[in-house]
Amino acid sequence: MRILVVDNYDSFVFNLVQYLGQLGIEAEVWRNDDHRLSDEAAVAGQFDGVLLSPGPGTPERAGASVSIVHACAAAHTPLLGVCLGHQAIGVAFGATVDRAPELLHGKTSSVFHTNVGVLQGLPDPFTATRYHSLTILPKSLPAVLRVTARTSSGVIMAVQHTGLPIHGVQFHPESILTEGGHRILANWLTCCGWTQDDTLVRRLENEVLTAISPHFPTSTASAGEATGRTSA
């Protein structure tokens, strides 16, 4: 299986790559201005799935990101957008991305979802780590994108295309404080043709819980996560 991660110059993109590797996937990583992305249609045709990473700035300034969304849509290639990549999906289909009601950098929120797509099998709500100042504006969302997760205040946390294998999450599944990060990626990989190993996914989830529990008890985990992330 060939999976491409488009790196939007995010400081923690290799956490995503590591999670994929733990699921048995050796992803290729190309920067968003890599010359190989100039033929987006060819790229969409040669990979089983494309992941658009988080990163700083706006979708329009994230190299080939928006063009890759169009190419994957045309080829029906499974696509997952994370944070900035999620916003690129919105822009590609006509939504407006603008300032979020609150600026969050390394803070956790409860996310309420519809238990479909990449979020299937997660607790409702689940805890997710957020690093963003921009968001897809709900009133601008086109009919082809449906909201699959929100915060309690209504900020869009995930979208899914109504007819294509295209998914976006505003939060960061690769953060150690996000519940079910491996499961989210595993759910997406099944769209790409991967046979899900639920025993493996549960083991990885338990390893994350074991690693953080001595340092981030439930009462303090929501206080946030201090990192040097550069995401928008």
From Swiss-Prot:
SUPFAM superfamilies documented for this protein: Class I glutamine amidotransferase-like
InterPro entries assigned to the protein according to its UniProt record, in alphabetical order: Anth_synth/Amidotransfase (IPR050472), Class_I_gatase-like (IPR029062), GATASE (IPR017926), TrpG/PapA_dom (IPR006221)
Span of domain Glutamine amidotransferase type-1: 2-198
Active site: C83, H172, E174
GO MF term (any one): anthranilate synthase activity
Signal peptide, first to last residue: none
Biological processes annotated in GO: L-tryptophan biosynthetic process
Pathway terms, separated by semicolons: Amino-acid biosynthesis; L-tryptophan biosynthesis; L-tryptophan from chorismate: step 1/5
Main EC class the enzyme belongs to: lyase
GO CC aspect terms: plasma membrane
Assembly, per entry: Heterotetramer consisting of two non-identical subunits: a beta subunit (TrpG) and a large alpha subunit (TrpE).
Miscellaneous comment: Was identified as a high-confidence drug target.
Name listed for the protein in its UniProt record: Anthranilate synthase component 2
Organism of this sequence: Mycobacterium tuberculosis (strain ATCC 25618 / H37Rv)
